[in-house]
Each structure stands twice: as structure tokens, then as C-alpha cells.
Amino acid sequence: MYRETFVFCVLLAVVSANVEMRDLEEKPEKYKGVNCCYVSAIQECIPVGETRPFKHECKGWTCNKDNLLEVSCGKVLVEHYVEDKTAPYPHCCPVAKA
């Protein structure tokens, strides 16, 4: 049990994310009545419960019923990690190397 707790605490310290909550934007007429979050930056309406990656950054938007979350990888707290900056979020986030 001690080992599992220790490993969990280490992973918790190594893995972090950055989340910013945004108010929902007003939807254009064509999206009125659609259960989605309109994002003017991409001129797209993301269905509630889904995530869309940013085009040129390792971030994503997650649509919730009452808000839009802008999510990114956060900081890596280890010296050795791998990342694929060409992959869409969240696959572009750094991962600790064993």
C-alpha cells in the first residue's frame, strides 16, 4: 500500500495541467438551439462534452453546459521527457520518460 501511495504522489507532482474557464460566447443564428459552445477564434460550435484542439498550440477547448474550458498541458516537473509538438492536444503534451 505504501508503494502505491508513493507512486501516486510522485505522479501527482509530475503531471499537471492548466485550465482556464471562459464564459460562453453568443452563438451566431445558424447555431441557435444547438447544444454546443461557439468559439469565434475557430468559427466553430463544439458539441457539449467534446474537446477540440487548437490549430497551432498544444491546447484544447472543452465545451461544458455552462462554460468553455481552455486546457493546456501545464508544466513538466521532470528532467527527462518526450513530446510531439506536431500532434493535436492532448497527444502533444510532454510525457515523463522512464
Curated annotation (Swiss-Prot):
Compartment(s) of residence: Secreted
Tissues where the protein occurs: Expressed by the venom apparatus.
GO cellular component term, pick one: extracellular region
Keyword Disulfide bond: yes
Signal sequence annotation: 1-17
InterPro entries: SVWC_dom
The entry's keywords: Disulfide bond, Secreted, Signal, Toxin
Domain of life: Eukaryota
Pfam families the record matches: SVWC
The keyword Cell membrane belongs to this UniProt entry's keyword annotation: no
One Gene Ontology term of the molecular function aspect: toxin activity
UniProt similarity note: Belongs to the caterpillar 1 family.
Annotated protein name in UniProt: U-megalopygitoxin(1)-Mo1
Organism the protein comes from: Megalopyge opercularis
